């Protein structure tokens, strides 16, 4: 495993971690949303801990085996008994787990702030067919613990979106933490219940084209006090409450639209996914995908001429429409695939990781300094909102949403009223 510059990561061990006790052998159907073609892939994330390196590999390996007894489908494989209908075969074959060691401290690599001073391929597992023998889109989860000389460690995780959404993946990782701290069972017991998600006859639309956009990578931090101030402004504007996500996303959409300097009459789009757990009254332990897109489209002039608070109004109205649109989808009152996306430079996609639960995971060494996705692509203009790394207080944006040509104006707008 090659490092960057003088730093090197060496793999110590690898193999399958299987459930610690016998589990049912069965094939479980996935929900409509789980089966969606774009969800058949591994989401990569990085979880950085300041201490615990010596004990972490053994503790987490053992806890993983015990957690898989409760979450036994995750120890299986994705199969496709019928074309277009993937399912999980509960084989107890296990989760890929690797232990590695870096010859540097976390401080040496700036706690893996961007740009990374170690390749992500050294931090998250890419075993290849010769060492794992399972195609990535049929693998449910892979994990790697990398120890650093300072006593800290990094968990690199690859989790198949077909098996769980972000909240479900965090539920499982928290269950591993529960086992690591000696609990006899997870605090939140898993529930399958995939049949409770609607299963309309709507066919997924064709996969969209993916343009190469050559996006810049930008990190922005917003203190809690600043976000609270924006929320207070919205309360004064409307008499209603809003979330930090609402105000930051409104500011983001407006600043990005201004930075793009589009031709008059251009349409700009914003999309994010919202949970429908409350609409379906799902059990707290449900860990499958339970998301639905919230989409907005407006002339660029409208976004630019509105105040940030008026853009918040637009976002909140779209969130309110989501419930109606979801039940239209569930009752097959529409023939359109609501998950069909348009990927062009005028469209932006926002993902909220701030409340999923990854930042609260504790394996007995305290919560992570940072937990977030390893996303940096050149074909989807996207932003991830998540908790700022400790000891910072507030929210971080990981933005891959503008080209270098537009990044200076975008950053200037986002920072112009920061304290």
Curated annotation (Swiss-Prot):
Enzyme Commission (EC) number: 2.3.1.-
Keyword hit for Membrane: no
Residues annotated as the enzyme's active site: 161, 362
GO function terms (MF aspect): hydroxycinnamoyltransferase activity
The name this protein goes by in its record: Acyl transferase 9
Protein keywords: Acyltransferase, Transferase
One Pfam family in the UniProt entry: Transferase
Gene: AT9
Similarity-based family: Belongs to the plant acyltransferase family.
Enzyme class: transferase
Superkingdom of this protein's organism: Eukaryota
Function field: Involved in the incorporation of ferulate into the cell wall. May act as arabinoxylan feruloyl transferase.
């Amino acid at each position: 495993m090659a490092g960057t510059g003088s730093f090197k990561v060496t793999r110590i061990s690898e193999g399958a971690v299987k459930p610690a006790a016998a589990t049912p052998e069965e094939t479980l159907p996935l929900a409509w949303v789980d089966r969606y073609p774009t969800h058949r892939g591994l989401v990569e994330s990085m979880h950085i801990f300041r201490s615990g390196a010596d004990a972490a590999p053994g503790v987490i390996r053992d806890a993983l085996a015990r957690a898989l007894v409760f979450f036994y489908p995750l120890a299986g494989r994705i199969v496709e008994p019928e074309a277009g209908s993937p399912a999980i075969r509960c084989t107890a074959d296990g989760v890929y787990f690797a232990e590695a060691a870096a010859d540097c401290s976390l401080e040496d690599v700036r706690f893996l702030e961007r740009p990374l001073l170690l390749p992500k391929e050294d931090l998250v597992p890419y075993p290849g067919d010769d060492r794992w023998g399972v195609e990535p889109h049929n693998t449910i989860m892979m994990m790697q613990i990398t120890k650093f000389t300072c006593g800290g460690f990094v968990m690199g995780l690859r989790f198949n979106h077909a098996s769980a959404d972000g909240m479900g993946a965090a539920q499982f990782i928290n269950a591993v933490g529960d086992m690591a701290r000696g609990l006899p069972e997870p605090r939140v017991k898993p529930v399958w219940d995939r049949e409770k998600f609607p299963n309309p006859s709507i066919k997924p639309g064709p996969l969209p084209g993916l343009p190469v956009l050559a996006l810049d990578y930008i990190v922005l931090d917003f203190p809690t006090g600043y976000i609270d101030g924006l929320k207070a402004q919205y309360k004064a504007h409307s008499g209603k409450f809003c979330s930090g996500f609402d105000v930051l996303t409104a500011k983001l959409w407006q600043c990005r639209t201004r930075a793009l300097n589009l031709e008059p009459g251009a349409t700009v789009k914003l999309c994010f996914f919202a949970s429908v757990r409350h609409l379906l009254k799902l059990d707290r332990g449900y860990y499958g995908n339970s998301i639905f897109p919230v989409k907005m489209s407006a002339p660029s002039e409208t976004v630019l001429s509105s105040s940030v608070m008026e853009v918040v109004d637009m976002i909140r109205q779209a969130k309110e429409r989501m419930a109606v649109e979801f039940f239209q989808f569930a009752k097959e009152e529409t023939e359109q695939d609501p998950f069909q996306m348009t990927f062009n430079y005028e469209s932006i996609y926002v993902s909220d990781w701030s409340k999923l639960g990854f930042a609260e995971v504790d394996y007995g060494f305290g919560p992570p300094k940072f937990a977030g996705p390893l996303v940096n692509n050149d074909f989807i203009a996207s932003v991830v909102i998540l908790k700022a790394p400790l000891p910072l207080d507030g929210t971080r944006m990981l933005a891959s949403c503008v080209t270098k040509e537009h990044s200076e104006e975008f950053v200037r707008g986002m920072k112009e009223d920061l304290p």
